[in-house]
């Protein structure tokens, strides 16, 4: 029996196939792992792009906390400083205005009370106010005798003080009359040589003569009061009383005439005021059309204020004259002994003093306004 020879070439292809299969499996595994890695990377990239889209859709908010707080604090500090500075500025302006008003009123009060007329008016108001109080005390059931006697003594002293303040007006009026007479005589020699003595009566002011006689009677009453207070009683006491009653009657009559003449003067002031108001209205409408009237009517600066103050002064002067006429009628008729007449006299006299004080205050305003405009 013959044995077959061993074929060695058969086993070699089987080994190569196995090696190829193993390498193919390894390649497939590597490819699968690589492909799976690529999928995971692509998913992560897709998710990242989606998140970017979502973020892009959201509104962009820029926040800078430190800078915003700093600017807000700066704004708050700036507004606080501005408000405090405005308040302090307003306070300083208000204090300056208050000081100006105080100084202005103080100057006006000095102008009123430093004059003899202002002191006389204030003493008049005080005298008749105390007189009214003494009359009201008489109606009380419980009478204060000591207080009433002291009150009457104060009233007498105030009346005497008023006579002291008016003392010397007769000499001033007499000097004015003599000066006026000399001026008229010189005018007659220069321009009116052919005129008669009636020239003096036409151009002489009747008010000055009446005022001079009134001041003369006023000073005679003062001398009589001083004599009765400090002098000794003599045998001619009855004759002096008769003479002084006559002087007092003439004193009241002359005061009534002066008030009537003052009404005439007040009417002339009203006419002049109306002219000035018309002139001012024309001047405000057409200033170029009144150049020919500037020499005839001269108004000071700050015309509206001055005209208003002048109007108030003329009105107060008119009220004062009316009250003086009413109070003096009670003196002329001699009815001050009655209670009602005396009460009316005291009330009217207080009203007259108040109106005269207001007139002096307005006059002080006019002078201060004129000084201010002249300074400007």
Curated annotation (Swiss-Prot):
GO biological process: peroxisome fission; peroxisome organization; regulation of peroxisome size
Primary site of residence: membrane
Compartmental location: Peroxisome membrane
GO cellular component, one term: peroxisome
Keyword presence, Transport: no
Keyword annotations of the record: Membrane, Peroxisome, Peroxisome biogenesis
Topology with respect to the bilayer: Peripheral membrane protein
Coiled-coil positions: none
Keyword flag Phosphoprotein: no
Function of the molecule: Required for regulation of peroxisome size and number. Also promotes peroxisome division and biogenesis.
Quaternary structure and partners: Homooligomer. Interacts with PEX25 and PEX34.
Miscellaneous note of the record: Present with 382 molecules/cell in log phase SD medium.
Protein name: Peroxisomal membrane protein PEX27
This protein's encoding gene: PEX27
């Amino acid at each position: 029996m013959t044995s077959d020879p061993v074929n060695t070439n058969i086993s070699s292809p089987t080994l190569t196939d196995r090696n190829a299969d193993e390498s193919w499996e390894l390649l497939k595994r590597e490819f699968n792992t690589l492909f799976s890695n690529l999928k995971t990377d692509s998913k992560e990239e897709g998710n990242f792009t989606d998140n970017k889209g979502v973020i892009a859709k959201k509104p962009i908010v820029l926040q800078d906390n430190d800078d915003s707080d700093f600017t807000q604090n700066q704004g708050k500090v700036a507004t606080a400083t501005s408000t405090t500075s405005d308040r302090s500025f307003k306070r300083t302006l208000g204090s300056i205005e208050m000081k100006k008003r105080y100084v202005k009123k103080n100057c006006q009060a000095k102008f009123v009370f430093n004059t003899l007329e202002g002191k006389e008016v204030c003493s008049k108001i005080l005298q008749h106010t105390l007189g009214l109080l003494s009359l009201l005390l008489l109606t009380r059931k419980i009478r204060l005798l000591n207080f009433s006697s002291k009150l009457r003594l104060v009233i007498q002293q105030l009346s005497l003080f008023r006579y002291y303040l008016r003392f010397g007006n007769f000499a001033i009026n007499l000097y004015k009359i003599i000066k006026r007479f000399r001026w008229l005589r010189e005018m007659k020699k220069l321009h009116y040589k052919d005129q008669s003595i009636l020239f003096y009566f036409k151009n002489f002011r009747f008010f000055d003569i009446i005022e001079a006689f009134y001041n003369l009677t006023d000073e005679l009453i003062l001398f009589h009061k001083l004599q009765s207070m400090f002098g000794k009683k003599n045998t001619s006491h009855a004759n002096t009383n008769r003479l002084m009653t006559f002087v007092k009657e003439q004193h009241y009559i002359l005061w009534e005439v002066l008030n009537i003449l003052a009404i005439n003067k007040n009417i002339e002031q009203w006419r002049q005021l109306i002219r000035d108001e018309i002139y001012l209205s024309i001047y405000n409408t057409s200033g170029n059309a009144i150049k020919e009237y500037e020499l005839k009517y001269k108004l000071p600066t700050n015309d509206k204020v001055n005209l208003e103050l002048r109007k108030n002064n003329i009105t107060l002067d008119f009220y004062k004259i009316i009250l003086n006429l009413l109070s003096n009628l009670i003196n002329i008729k001699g009815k001050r002994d009655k209670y009602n007449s005396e009460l009316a006299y005291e009330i009217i006299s207080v009203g007259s003093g108040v109106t005269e004080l207001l007139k002096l205050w307005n006059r002080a305003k006019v002078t201060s306004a004129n000084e201010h405009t002249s300074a400007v």
